[in-house]
Amino acid sequence: MKPLVVFVLGGPGAGKGTQCARIVEKYGYTHLSAGELLRDERKNPDSQYGELIEKYIKEGKIVPVEITISLLKREMDQTMAANAQKNKFLIDGFPRNQDNLQGWNKTMDGKADVSFVLFFDCNNEICIDRCLERGKSSGRSDDNRESLEKRIQTYLESTKPIIDLYEEMGKVKKIDASKSVDEVFGDVMKIFDKEG
């Protein structure tokens, strides 16, 4: 059985992680956060990629696509090997740019099906405020204003065109992410109840 994938996209602080956790609980998806996989890998002393990832993340740059895809693929393979029924995945924070998308199409073509793109649309100021709030407790080194403005810039330049591309294919489900967590999840449920 091939993995069924929903790409979850939106700017930093749009609430992707929070909503993914709820989708997992209610709909039995497995949540893979590209950023989290990279952060874990970077901390793993045995990783062949650790230092390289560290360098990219520190500079606010996007990690080379081969690394990200190999981590995503490894996780999907391991999850499905452990339980063949678990073939539905939410991939959060990927593809972030054209290069990511091409890499995915090249590597995963015929190996995984993308059902749709869940796009959390959120005003930049709201996103920044949420991240600064989160930074107080998350300990994430990139939750500071300077890093955030860079991340939002990168997102607008690189990720937004990907969303537009999927939009043309009729594959984007757009959600107003500036609402409260519960309201946003209400909108998410409408989509997943229909799409499964």
Swiss-Prot record:
A Pfam family of this chain: ADK
Residues with PTM N6-acetyllysine: K43, K55
Cofactor note as given: Binds 1 Mg(2+) ion per monomer.
Q: What is this protein called?
A: UMP-CMP kinase
Q: Where does a ribonucleoside 5'-phosphate bind?
A: R39, K61, I62, V63, G93, F94, P95, R96, R140, R151
Region (NMP) residue ranges read 33-63
Q: Name one GO molecular function term.
A: ATP binding
The main location class comes to nucleus
* Annotated source species: Rattus norvegicus
Residue numbers carrying N6-succinyllysine = K106
Q: Which residues are listed for ATP binding in this entry?
A: G13, A14, G15, K16, G17, T18, R134, K179
Where exactly is the Glycyl lysine isopeptide (Lys-Gly) (interchain with G-Cter in SUMO2) cross-link placed along the chain?
K73
The biological process GO terms on file are: 'de novo' pyrimidine nucleobase biosynthetic process; CDP biosynthetic process; dCDP biosynthetic process; dUDP biosynthetic process; ovulation cycle process; phthalate metabolic process; UDP biosynthetic process
Subunit composition? Monomer.
Localization recorded for this chain is: Nucleus; Cytoplasm
Q: Which UniProt keywords apply?
A: Acetylation, ATP-binding, Cytoplasm, Isopeptide bond, Kinase, Nucleotide-binding, Nucleus, Phosphoprotein, Pyrimidine biosynthesis, Transferase, Ubl conjugation
Positions carrying Phosphoserine: S33, S180
What this protein needs as a cofactor is: Mg(2+)
